[in-house]
């Protein structure tokens, strides 16, 4: 994390690898999710890897991403086999990762067993990156301490030295600067190897220093719940608070606490307040620009784009049991531009599925309407009269996620509804845009109900786009 970490951002990226409870179902590669508030994180690329490491055994765990003063992104991560190396790569755009290699950070320390969960902070005073990680030396993993090195160019490094040793086993450190002080969240793992001497379960605690390099002193009375690890700080400018994220690795979930001053922390936020991708583990969170977020959404969440202007219904899915526009979903967005020559009657803009499981958007007697249905349960919303315009291009979008259905016109939300609906099940009806292709989600099946006008730039996304996203697209 940069020492100047309080930035005016409204977009955040999370990098993570995946596994189930207790290290099962492992997918040890780089994954992405994004958030607007730091609480609800939506997976990109359908929760599949966005980048795969080729060093060592091809394993990427505990990714940490940070931006340098030149705007370039740097990625460090845990690799296998165990030993004196960590993984490294750099990127201009968070999409193409280059210069992949191992960094021999513990090569000069005898009997190094492992080098785990590396992170770094940029030291603006010395124009250097401070890289820190946990290593154990000897015969096993029972004496992990934190070591560090410095670099200006990621090519040459200062001799490795001890960074933090509280006298017991620690891993998973993360640093942040707040009002001239440096705070460290770090996992106390002493119980794992010495349960009789340290009977309290593993958890994360906080320490503070006046200098980036330390020494750090423990802040009494602040810790995350039992059986947590992988702490990570993020400043969320919209609420002027720090969020501390941590991983219940054995239970397959995340927890979040928050503070405005790094001294007084909330209790753990309720699970209803947060959302994380399924099986996400040991994440890194970083603020990004609107331009960067939109590029990532277009790369990893855009399912299909139909740019050509059309004046009649376009079928994009046949009547069949599998394939595009037939798969179950919990999140989806459809965005299009249309020019209507009339707004009377029924004119279907988008038609997926049927009246049992489906999603649809239409013009109905001057109103813009949308509906989602799952196993026959329906959620229908409509905008107000006098919003639609004739003979000029407009942007319409419908978004769905976590039971919330939103309808947008020219980047402004005109209707929103919520129902106890999450999964829209597989559906085998034909579908498309600019008209109806069977019995639609509204329950109507009388003819094509074609748009009287033109449609162009139809885009379907695998995430529930938000108002800020759509405004960037207008």
Tell where the protein language model's regions lie, with residue ranges.
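Short, aromatic/His-centered strand-loop micro-motif at the edge of beta-sheets
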Residues: 370-395
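Flexible glycan-contacting loops in extracellular carbohydrate-active proteins
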Residues: 417-454
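Short strand-turn-strand beta-turns centered on an Asx-Gly dipeptide
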Residues: 408-411, 416
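Beta-strand-rich interaction surfaces with strong enrichment in secreted/lumenal proteins
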Residues: 220-221, 273, 321-325, 382-387
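Carbohydrate-active catalytic/glycan-binding domains of CAZyme proteins
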Residues: 1-308
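Extracellular glycan-recognition modules
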Residues: 311-371, 378, 404-405, 445-449, ...
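Localized edge beta-strand/strand-to-loop motifs within extracellular or lumenal beta-rich domains
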Residues: 392-406
């Amino acid at each position: 994390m940069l020492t100047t970490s309080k930035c005016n951002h409204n977009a955040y990226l999370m990098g993570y690898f995946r596994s189930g409870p207790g290290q099962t179902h492992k997918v040890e590669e780089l994954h992405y999710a994004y958030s607007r508030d730091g609480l609800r994180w939506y997976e990109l690329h359908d929760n599949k890897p966005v980048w795969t490491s080729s060093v060592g055994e091809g394993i990427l765990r505990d990714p940490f991403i940070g931006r340098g003063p030149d705007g370039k992104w740097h990625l460090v991560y845990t690799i296998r086999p165990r030993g004196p190396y960590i993984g490294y790569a750099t990127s201009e755009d968070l999409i193409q990762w280059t210069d992949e290699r191992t960094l021999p950070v513990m090569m000069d320390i005898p009997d190094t067993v492992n080098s785990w969960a590396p992170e770094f902070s940029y030291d603006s005073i010395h124009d250097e990156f401070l890289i820190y990680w946990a290593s154990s030396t000897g015969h096993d993993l029972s004496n992990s301490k934190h070591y560090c090195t410095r670099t200006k160019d990621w090519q040459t490094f200062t001799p490795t030295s001890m960074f933090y040793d509280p006298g017991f086993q620690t891993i998973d450190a993360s640093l942040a600067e707040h009002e001239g002080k440096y705070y460290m969240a770090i996992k106390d793992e002493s119980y794992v190897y010495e349960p009789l001497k340290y009977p309290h379960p593993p958890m994360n605690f906080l320490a503070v220093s006046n200098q980036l390099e330390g020494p750090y002193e423990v802040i009494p009375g602040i810790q995350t719940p039992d059986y947590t690890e992988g702490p990570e700080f993020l400043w969320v400018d919209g609420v002027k608070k720090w969020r501390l994220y941590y991983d219940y690795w054995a239970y397959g979930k995340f927890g979040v606490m928050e503070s405005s001053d790094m001294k007084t922390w909330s209790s753990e936020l309720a699970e209803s307040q947060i959302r994380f991708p399924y099986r996400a583990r040991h994440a890194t969170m970083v603020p990004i620009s609107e331009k960067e977020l939109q590029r990532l959404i277009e790369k990893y969440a855009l399912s299909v784009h139909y740019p050509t202007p059309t004046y009649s219904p376009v079928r994009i899915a046949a009547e069949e049991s599998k394939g595009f526009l037939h798969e179950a979903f919990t999140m989806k967005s459809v965005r299009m531009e249309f020019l209507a020559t009339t707004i009377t009657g029924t004119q279907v803009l988008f038609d997926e599925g049927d009246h049992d499981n489906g999603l649809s958007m239409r013009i109905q007697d001057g109103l813009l309407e949308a509906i989602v249905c799952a196993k026959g349960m329906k959620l229908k919303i409509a905008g107000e009269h006098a919003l639609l315009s004739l003979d000029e291009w407009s942007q319409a979008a419908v978004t769905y996620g976590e039971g919330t259905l939103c309808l947008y016109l020219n980047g402004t939300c005109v209707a929103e509804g919520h129902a106890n609906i999450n999964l829209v099940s597989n559906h085998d009806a034909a579908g498309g845009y600019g008209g109806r292709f069977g019995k639609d989600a509204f329950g109507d099946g009388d003819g094509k109900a074609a748009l009287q006008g033109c449609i162009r730039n139809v885009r379907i996304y695998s995430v529930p786009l938000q108002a800020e996203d759509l405004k960037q697209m207008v």
